């Protein structure tokens, strides 16, 4: 198998990264160990190479208006320097991918450029889908990553570390805010302009940075010198699951609607604009979905994994989509789908794990919420 390498691949190996195949890329699953990496992000700061993810630039006349036809979230709610999380839908309201849209415009009335970050596993299909629907309207799509680096710096100390390295104040940048930040000492050409967004996939404060390969490699080494712990896919998964953040392909897919996935807050049916799958979602909003994604806490230390059956009165009623041992809570947690009648908080079901039944209780999501948001 010919796996792709990010510009940080050799630096990840040098830092002790244990590499595994992921979505066609050779990526680090862990460095010092999952628990240490997880705790570093929860308590201090950690960094992730996420350069495997897709980054697209949309340019043209009012690209937001044309992209609106493909997503259920009112894009007029964001302006220049702002971003939103949403989902890409098909005609039946099924989720093709989840993504973050960044408005790169200079004013809200005349936004000519957007940035979209998409999942690595969906990068090719998303690009084809977007081109199919946007190019006829005169919207140009291009690879904004351009073999560069996408790096996530996450944790309560992320702001201090990034301010120290950039010399700029970032504390006032709001959640889902973004701007260009000038860094010195990241390459032959000073300063290096870095796209910095206050976004992440861990449930902690933090930033995601897009920059050229040379500058990205230099920044990685500077962060290591600052004592920032490199983190792999393993801790990224436990962190996002504690925060009840969805993993596309596991917790939702093309056969899942936003209402089923607990993402109904992304569907703005009050806006007049038509969008892909609107009719199906209007009907589901009126009737209610027949199943829902729920958070579960398990008794004991058994771990529920993707695909494990959920049982009620010894009958299979659903499946686990994601599960792990929570380092922060010291409990087994999981996400899974249950019939709506069984999806109420406090209800008990069972998970079948290697032939044995383990009690699981439906709980409120997220499982973990960082102290500043409590």
Swiss-Prot record:
Domain of life: Bacteria
Catalytic EC class: transferase
The entry's keywords: Aminotransferase, Transferase
Entry-linked Pfam families: GCV_T, GCV_T_C
BP terms from Gene Ontology: glycine decarboxylation via glycine cleavage system
E.C. code: 2.1.2.10
GO CC entries: cytosol; glycine cleavage complex
Catalytic reaction(s) noted: N(6)-[(R)-S(8)-aminomethyldihydrolipoyl]-L-lysyl-[protein] + (6S)-5,6,7,8-tetrahydrofolate = N(6)-[(R)-dihydrolipoyl]-L-lysyl-[protein] + (6R)-5,10-methylene-5,6,7,8-tetrahydrofolate + NH4(+)
Keyword Transferase part of the UniProt annotation: yes
GO molecular function list: aminomethyltransferase activity; transaminase activity
Transmembrane segments: none
Keyword check for Nucleotidyltransferase: no
Function per UniProt: The glycine cleavage system catalyzes the degradation of glycine.
UniProt-listed PANTHER family: AMINOMETHYLTRANSFERASE (PTHR43757), AMINOMETHYLTRANSFERASE, MITOCHONDRIAL (PTHR43757:SF2)
NCBIfam families per UniProt: gcvT, PRK00389.1
Quaternary context: The glycine cleavage system is composed of four proteins: P, T, L and H.
Family of this protein: Belongs to the GcvT family.
HAMAP family the UniProt entry points to: GcvT
UniProt protein name: Aminomethyltransferase
Lineage: Bacteria, Bacillati, Cyanobacteriota, Cyanophyceae, Synechococcales
Gene name as annotated: gcvT
């Amino acid at each position: 198998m010919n796996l792709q390498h990010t510009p940080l691949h050799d630096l990840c190996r040098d830092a002790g990264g244990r590499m595994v195949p992921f979505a066609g890329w050779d990526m680090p699953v862990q460095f010092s160990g999952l628990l240490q990496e997880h705790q570093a992000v929860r308590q201090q700061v950690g960094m992730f190479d996420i350069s495997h993810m897709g980054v697209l630039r949309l340019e043209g006349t009012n690209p937001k208006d044309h992209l609106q036809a493909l997503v259920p979230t009112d894009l007029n709610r964001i302006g220049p320097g702002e971003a939103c999380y949403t989902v890409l839908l098909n005609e039946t309201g099924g989720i093709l991918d989840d993504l973050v849209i960044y408005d790169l415009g200079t004013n809200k009335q005349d936004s000519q450029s957007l940035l979209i970050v998409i999942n690595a596993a969906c990068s090719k299909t998303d690009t084809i889908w977007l081109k199919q629907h946007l190019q006829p309207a005169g919207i140009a799509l291009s690879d904004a990553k351009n073999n560069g680096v996408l790096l996530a710096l996450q944790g309560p100390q992320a702001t201090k570390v990034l301010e120290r390295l950039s010399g700029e104040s970032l504390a006032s940048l709001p959640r889902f805010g973004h701007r260009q930040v000038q860094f010195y000492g990241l390459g032959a050409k000073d300063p290096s302009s870095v796209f910095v967004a206050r976004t992440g996939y861990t449930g902690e404060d933090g930033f995601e940075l897009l920059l050229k390969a040379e500058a990205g490699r230099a920044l990685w080494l500077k962060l290591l010198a600052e004592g920032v712990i490199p983190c792999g896919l393993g801790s990224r998964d436990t962190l996002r699951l504690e925060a009840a953040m969805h993993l596309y392909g596991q917790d939702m897919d093309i056969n899942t609607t936003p209402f089923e996935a607990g993402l109904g807050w992304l569907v703005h049916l009050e806006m007049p604009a038509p969008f892909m799958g609107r009719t199906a979602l209007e009907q589901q909003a009126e009737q209610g979905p027949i199943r829902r994604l729920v958070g579960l806490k398990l008794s004991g230390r058994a771990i529920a994994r993707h695909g494990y059956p959920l049982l009620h009165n010894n009958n299979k009623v659903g499946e686990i989509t994601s599960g792990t041992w929570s380092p922060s809570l010291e409990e087994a947690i999981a996400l899974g789908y249950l019939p709506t009648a069984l999806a109420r908080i406090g209800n008990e079901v069972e998970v079948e794990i290697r032939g044995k039944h383990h009690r699981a209780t439906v709980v409120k999501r997220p499982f973990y919420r960082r102290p500043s948001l409590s």
